[in-house]
């Protein structure tokens, strides 16, 4: 009988420990500033500036004290769920914007409608597309910390070697220039230098093809309907597939990271990338230029890379008030300007003039093209599946599949994903 | 329930049984001293396993009947998740892929391990210690790092393998983005990393086989192949059974290198069940569904392993 | 192919002096053939390891260069300095030792005790317990991660060594593995001891365990290596950067845009490999010795 008692004993012991653990959980300190933990993924020099902004906020008042923890974005994504599930999570967390809807939908983030409505929140002048990123079903669940459209980076030395003086501004010019910049000296069928690096899956911020589709006049999701199967999208995909496979202006099978590397190693003359390409290109001694993604037949649109932060459900009232106070502080004009210059991303307020950010040429250049920015899949909860459906579409198209069939399949799958 | 004790002393009919606590059948099995002993041996491990393995498994089972994300609201949904496991296209595809992966990985890894174990067991081979260490090294590399190294080797632009093979006139192309080559590639990485460990287990098993048996066979004129078939293979039955189950379980749970090298692509051709579990749980925050899928995987693995176990136990009994 | 141990004593004593030569010549030929085959295949299999070693010493430009090189053209220690400046790497290595070492120590003790009970002691539910233990191997860690984390957090052990080690202090694989091994050991010695009245713990400690050294060493290496290389658990469990392990620390190396600095990553991996390699080299000799003395039955 002892043996059967054993599991019971062990479980009883475990339960006892659990209860002991539970009762030991801390009641919030009744005096002293409310302690708030803030997770973010700014790991480079920009992270240090953000930490400084937080420190300044802490110094500016007595009621709240924020402590930051820096991890990579991927690690935050992997560790946030367990932390929240055991109430060990941060009260403020920043994450890539397309990850926000799924967390918001599951109740991880607090509804910030009242915050936005209040007059001293400093949110009235925020870039509207940036705010679009944090809304699910019309309700805002966070605030933007970064919003920048993908830009075209080009290698000035390779340009001048090919006799091209300006970055292209339309698709046709883009392809023409790329053809001139694709060089296969030894004629073995594999160019040593490509005109452009166009990934066909896992693109930079998953934004390259959405940019092209939008510029071609098509959309992916409209409200709660998948609308990817449209004549405009078919033309766009066919246009670019032909350019890649027939004119060979880019290798096939690239992903976003490989495309980054191709450009930074000087083997591709043009590349659609994020702001970090500036410092990477500089580290690799590439004389680079920044331009807007060339305009398509319908418009000049660039999918935006967005980062947002929100208040988690593990925050109590005091902590939530503190978080909102921090957000207001963060959006003050001077702080917003400082953050823009440090992060290398355009300012989040529309009323900050270009002259204020001219000290950082990358920021100035990106701010100029900021109007081309469009949020990626705003409000789509299951962005994971939609993005992989888009990837499958583009990858198979570039590999030679039938574009119309692929679009029909993608439409069905995306519709399923957003239901 | 009695357990078969292979070397229990034979029962003498009607004889007086001494009251010593011999490991074997009999009512004295349940003496308090005996039970205390059993408990004492089992307790430390059982406490850990009950608290940190059994209880979370029960938790996960409960979660599998809900739509929980791990935090916030959760709602009981009955068997909905399980139905979805068997009707969702992506999940069914993942099951097919996992089966393919297991079918490729298990025999190849075991054959390679056994082959090298036999070679390294041969006293005619010089520098055996060196080779044993070298062949074991892939095992001590973490799977993620191994995946990085292999991805780098297979990179279509700057990869060494592609470069060398191109020199020989073979165009490897973009292996990890090729729907037909991606799966063999991820299997290869796992085989490369794991065979060293299985090899060491086989070596231990081989060295347990008395050389006198081989001598007798030699004297009888048996060839190398015959010696392998009638001595080595049967005597390895216990070891083989263990390695097969362990390899199978590892194959059915394939995740790390796929996550690093292909992310489940291209077109989901390397998406395995555990990849789906991870993505459902951590990316789509569908912990309830992830738990249900885990339990289906557990059941499949259990059935397959029990079959293997029974198969090899019978062989072991025949061999002994 | 499987030319197994030929006993020199038998043939040498039987053979007349004329037949020794061809015999020895054939053995030398087989030796040479084996050497070539095994050496070639080993070298091929070592290629990825060589990649890790050499890439760690390559400057960034050469890592991405075309045509690719195996051996670095320019050797550099940059990657290594970066590893130690960008991460608290020394602390991470120490944490890895505590984690992997702690788990291995506890697991070897707890697992062998339980395995002994399963292999040698008859009790009701022995087979069922075994199946339950094996079954627990079949659920992937990703599924039980959240409940385990919640449990450990409720115990108040988040970010502590106790919490990191406890869930692994006994493991189903080890119990299964040792149970199989104990089963293969002959019972004569322990039965004799039992008849003499020795207690089970004594039998376990002085008879069974000494004969199980190769299995214990194998399991020890397996457990240590796997926990040293484990990523998901230390990553999720330690939110404090200083408490992480080497593997979880390396994930923090991802640069902006998801670009991984290959050279630095390889340097870190190489350093992470070294303790394991040294450990195996040390254990390996004992492994051979102990098998040599106890193996032939």
List each model region and its residues:
Chain B
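Short, Lys/Arg-rich, polar N-terminal cytosolic tail immediately upstream
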Residues: 1-32
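A structural signal for multi-pass alpha-helical bundles of membrane permease subunits
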Residues: 34-320
